[in-house]
Structure formats: structure tokens, C-alpha cells
Curated annotation (Swiss-Prot):
The gene is xseB. Belongs to the XseB family. It is an enzyme of class 3 (hydrolase). The keyword Disulfide bond does not apply. This is Exodeoxyribonuclease 7 small subunit. Its EC number is 3.1.11.6.
Length: 75
């Protein structure tokens, strides 16, 4: 299951918990599933955040090494 699918399921769970009159056991199961999905989504976001930081650091290193940004050279 990818990030978007997990987020969609999580949104559906939240909607059901907020809008439906569910039995306690079903509510608890949905809540537990929601927490599981939240944790997985959070982990994916954290991993991607680190990737972005690494790419930005690499880009900054390239800019620092050349002394100027390629975009500025094109202007």
C-alpha cells in the first residue's frame, strides 16, 4: 500500500469515526487501524524529508563549489 492509499484509508476511518454511530468494538478496531496508518505515513514523510534535506545539501555544495548558481549564469 502506498502513501496515498494509506492517507485515503485514514481519511475514511476518521470520517466513519466522526460521522457514524458505530459499536464500541468496531470503533476501537478502526481507531487502532487509524493509528497504525498514521505511524506508517509519518515514517514515510520523515524518510522523504531526510531525502529532500540530503538533496538540498548536495545542491548547496554544488553551488558553493562553483561559486555561483547556474540559474544566475543564465540570466
Amino acid at each position: 500500500m502506498n502513501f496515498e492509499e494509506m492517507m485515503k484509508e485514514l481519511e475514511e476511518i476518521v470520517n466513519r469515526l466522526e460521522n457514524e454511530d458505530l459499536p464500541l468494538e468496531e470503533s476501537i478496531k478502526l481507531f487502532e487501524r487509524g493509528v497504525e496508518l498514521y505511524r506508517k505515513c509519518k515514517e514515510i514523510l520523515q524518510q522523504n524529508r531526510l531525502k529532500i534535506i540530503d538533496v538540498m545539501k548536495e545542491l548547496e555544495g554544488e553551488i558553493d563549489a562553483s561559486g555561483r548558481d547556474q540559474e544566475n549564469e543564465l540570466r
